[in-house]
Amino acid sequence: MTTSPFTRRAVLATSAVLASSAALAACGGDSGGADTAEKIENPDENINPEGLPIVEEPVTITLMSRRAATSAEDWNQVSAAKEAQARTNIEVDWGLVAEEAAEERRNLLLTSGDYPEAFYRTGVPGGDLAKYGEQGVFVALNDLIDQYMPNLTARLEESPALRTGLTFPDGNIYSLPGIYDPETLGLRYQTKLWARQDWLEAAGMSAPETLEEYRAYLEEAKNAEDGAIPLGGSGIGGIFSCLYGTFGIANQGTDAGAAVDLDPESQKVRYYPASDGYREMLEFLHGLYADGLIQQDIYSSDFAAFTAAGTEGLLGSCANQAPAGYFGEVGKSYVPLKPLVRSAGDEPAWHAVRSELSSIGNFVMTDNCEHPVELARWMDFWYGEEGAKLFFLGVEGESYEEVDGRAELLPEVAEAASIDEGLRQHALFLGGWYPGWATGDWFRGVETSEQSTEGAKVVEPYALKEVWPAFTFTAEESQQITTLGNDITKYAEEAVAAFVTGERSLDEWDDHLATFEQIGLQDYVAAYQTAHERRS
């Protein structure tokens, strides 16, 4: 870094003037908030405003971080973290907390007031972002992004919908995003519907394209092997997703934060599990279940049982990213299906589309932050190509190498028992819930495997072109939505399971809709309509 102290002071002072008003508004009335605002207004001369290292003399930042079981026990021993420290001069006290205890720990820290400089990968809910943002506990990041985060700014400029999804009704951004590259199809179209090619051939069938043809295939699959499961899963949600386009629901994608889309007639927000299309989907699925064509314990089965059945070659059809990623060699025999249509001649439609804004709430800066500018610059490092490669791949030469312009994992990593096992001591992304920029150039997972990508190419021509990111609300709105949403979701899950399994007849649909209204569905939808209008 060659910037002189004089140049560094001049640049930082100019940036501070532009940042001061929002920083003061963002921070609460306690001394911690005032100190953080002061540090944003008057950055330390130790900070380099651009380039690396971020600081001339090392600085330590303190976080609370959720640690998934799939990640390393000590992140400072991960190659990517060690290399990032060497390049940035930022040392990190990660404050690792096991994922099962992370939510409780975060809430206790916020209640006590004795919280760290930032919460990292803890999944702060939108309601808490609004609540603590409005209180000044969470720092508004708008001007820090504009002045000190050029990599993230570039991502936001490439896709304005990202900024829209991050911004709260008060105009502030309180968290940093997880971003999916829209050109990486396996990330945008994750769950696909699959059928066994060898079973299709044995039955003399081509890949089904209509609901009737799909049912006929499942009937053949039922007798393909002893113990065969025509259509299975670890839960039924993935199967639902693959049928949304067929039945004209979820027409704004699957990342809105709730089961809402636009009513095709009124063009207003609707709760689509209360729509006619959803009822028709349940009717189709109940018919499959009643005839033994859907795994009979699908509502109680877990992921381990699902993968075991797939590995044993018992599944005729499933909905996931890529069967080969879970079932081993037998998984390679599955082929992706085009979006099913109700009748021959109907136009296929694919609505299981993820937003580019894959998550919010996984990085928030608090008003106890002693190093706000340093922390903003450190986070921005991960949104550039240099940092993103470290985050997802590790250090070149240790875990991957460049081959014909593409990063390829080294054999000892690629041939490990799993991608998680191979990259655990090299990369930081394991366990998900990360603020960062995922693209097919450096993200290595089942979503970007060859089979997943081929499946995504099959559905992509029929996919929604624009989808909603999650909505943001005021603290007051969030409290209402959370209360109503918990009751609505709990009832909906129980009722849907009963309709599919036949414990409850779909003849009771009108009573079902009446129950939704009694719970408060009208107010729930109205809140989403307000949020939709606010950002339209």
Predicted segments with their positions:
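Extracytoplasmic/secretory soluble proteins
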Residues: 2-7, 12-536
